[in-house]
């Protein structure tokens, strides 16, 4: 059995490109002078005062992540921006005052012609002054807001720092220490050409699909997750909202561009970004949370090869994956849901009888939106290092504020805390099982097809018995 990438996927990856230029215009925040040619599909919630008046935790986050961000410079930009906004409000108030006065004296008929002309002239001057102030404010506003949106999330107390990983769990199965051939040596099972073009043959092709379906069903049946189907394409505004580095995905070359700014990227449906479109500008009641979701599908994440070794299934761009996404009310609930996802993942991987571990990643490896990340890793005897086969991240309320995903309260609105991540990359799992000498056909998958078929047959027989 041959598992070939679909024609559409190959075409998209062939025509997709990533450009490394710095964008001068943000799709997430568009100033008034650019609003004529571009529209803003989202208006992020930005708490300038609250963020810039409590800099201690933010400074710690910036330092731990190794980011080159000058908070004093951003604060100076804010003061300049705020000063201009105050001048604009004052000019608008003066113009309104002149307009009201002119309307009143004209209605009363008590003003002379000179007084009316003087007020009209004053109104024209204020209008021109206001126009000048707004023109001056646009580049200042854009510079400040873009700098503000580049600020990272504050770190979770459990997040390790200083190039340190915290071990959460290690499976009892012993690690294979002996050097083994690479999985690419199995030419009868894997034909690898490059990262976006490979072929799985026979059992690996079947395992690729069944493992994804099995884990998805396990989360639905055991964890009570709601299964969703997400689009393979995500607009730039959502990538910016989730602070996703643009080099992670391919930019799609669109023939008909609905927007020169808000371009489409090929992400795959089993990605965190793939969920955001369904929750952007959504308002939910507190009683509907927590809201656990899971999606099975493709992931087209570009994996940088930092090992110096040849490309393999560990760096493949295309992979089947299982993505989790949970919205919660509080930070405490988010942490509990993160543990729940990890516990379900541990149940699944333990049945494979292979060594694996779960670690908290160092702060320097997180994206700006993440405050905590747990990596699910398996050991590669061929490359003598751990490979990430899945992960779960905590985003607190950082992303929900930027996509305006709100909780309706009695007197105000709050923002959900989000957790989630791809708990399985099938290509990496297949490669590691092969390298560790396990036969794919002998691996037990929780919630696999055989178990479901047996349960379905039993249910059908019970249904037939009703008519005897």
PLM region spans:
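N-terminal alpha-helical targeting/anchoring segments
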Residues: 2-3, 7, 11-13, 18-170
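TRNA-recognition modules of translation machinery and tRNA-sensing kinases, especially anticodon-binding
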Residues: 68, 83, 170-468
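A positional/structural detector of protein chain ends, strongest at the extreme C-terminus
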Residues: 1-3, 467-468
